[in-house]
């Protein structure tokens, strides 16, 4: 075992083995599918005429069998590729396995599209040649071509396979579409790599000081500081909506969220029922005071209590204020 392979973790090696299996299933399935289609067309289209008297029943059986096996292999490879992509998303890997370098520095999906395009293009050309150059007339086609005078009693000639002449160019067009998909996939991979390199360059440049030349003077500005709470968004997303408590590594809530939402802390959740009607007032003080504002928590029952005190004081003062009887 090479040292590079020994240094790789078991998960990466397992993913590479699965990727190779998916690739070979795709390729073998596509080859069997194309061969089966060709054998089926030749067995069911060309062998029904007397021009090919040696056509056996084996072609009519082997063609559909190869096509079905190839289609099953392609479907199995496709389902396995989707399962692997789902597993990588659960692991948190953003880059799909089909986009990684697989063969000659190219991705697996790009190589698959090239192979599919080549197979479909070759099959379409063979079918087109079979439909154009192989005559599909009866056994007496040569005799009827020589005897051009007696055409009244002769049946109309069916030379060439019209279905193959139509099906061949369609398969060629499908092969060209695979080449276009491969080109688009490569362009998207190149753009993604270029964006990643540009983001890395911007990140490295942001850590360097900025030099600004004004006339003969050169002003050097320090790099911007790192974010004060880099994990605030991640912790806020990971935290459940029902828990509003602050952890030591989380950023504090904003000023307005405290005075507007009024959500209780975990320590005071037991007394939340007693403070449902609590009102918060902010009263600005004088300039001479050390504090510029005082936050007073006034309950809804406080104004009636103040009125009771005032009435009590008035009742206590009323006997003293009345004149004494003579």
Curated annotation (Swiss-Prot):
Keyword check for Transmembrane: yes
Region ranges (Disordered): 229-326
Keyword Methyltransferase included in the entry's annotation: no
Pfam families: TMEM171
Localization, UniProt: Membrane
Alphabetically ordered keywords of this record: Membrane, Transmembrane, Transmembrane helix
Bilayer-spanning residue ranges: 22-42, 57-77, 114-134, 161-181
Positions in coiled-coil regions: none
Cited InterPro entries: TMEM171 (IPR029173)
Low complexity biased stretches: 230-240, 288-302, 312-326
One GO term describing the cellular component: membrane
Biased composition (Polar residues): 257-266
Topological relation to the membrane, as annotated: Multi-pass membrane protein
Protein known as: Transmembrane protein 171
Record lineage: Eukaryota, Metazoa, Chordata, Craniata, Vertebrata
């Amino acid at each position: 075992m090479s040292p590079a392979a020994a240094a790789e973790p078991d998960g990466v090696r397992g993913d590479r083995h699965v990727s190779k299996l998916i690739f070979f299933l795709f390729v073998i399935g596509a080859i069997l599918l194309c061969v089966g289609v060709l054998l089926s067309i030749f067995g069911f289209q060309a062998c029904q005429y007397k021009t090919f008297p040696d056509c056996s029943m084996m072609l009519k059986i082997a063609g559909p069998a190869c096509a079905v096996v190839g289609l099953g292999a392609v479907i199995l490879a496709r389902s396995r590729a989707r399962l692997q992509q789902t597993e990588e998303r659960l692991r948190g890997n953003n880059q799909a396995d089909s986009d990684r370098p697989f063969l000659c520095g190219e991705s697996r999906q790009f190589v698959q599209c090239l192979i599919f395009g080549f197979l479909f293009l070759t099959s379409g050309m063979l079918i087109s040649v079979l439909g154009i150059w192989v005559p599909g007339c009866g056994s007496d086609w040569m005799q009827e071509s020589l005897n051009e005078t007696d055409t009244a009693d002769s049946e109309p000639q069916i030379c060439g396979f019209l279905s193959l002449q139509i099906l061949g160019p369609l398969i060629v067009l499908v092969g060209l579409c695979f080449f276009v998909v491969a080109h688009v996939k490569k362009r998207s991979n190149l753009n993604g790599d270029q964006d990643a390199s540009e983001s890395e360059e911007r990140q490295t440049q942001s850590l360097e000081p900025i030099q600004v030349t004004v006339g003969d003077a050169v002003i050097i500005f320090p790099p911007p500081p790192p974010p004060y709470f880099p994990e605030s968004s991640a912790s806020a997303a990971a935290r459940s909506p029902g828990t509003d408590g602050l952890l030591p590594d989380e950023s504090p809530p904003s000023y307005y969220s405290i005075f507007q939402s009024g959500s209780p802390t975990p320590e005071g959740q037991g007394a939340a029922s007693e403070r449902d009607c609590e009102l918060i007032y902010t009263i600005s003080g004088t300039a001479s005071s050390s504090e510029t504002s005082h936050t007073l928590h006034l309950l809804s029952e406080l104004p009636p209590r103040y009125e009771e005190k005032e009435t009590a004081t008035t009742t206590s003062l009323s006997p003293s204020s009345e004149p004494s009887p003579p």
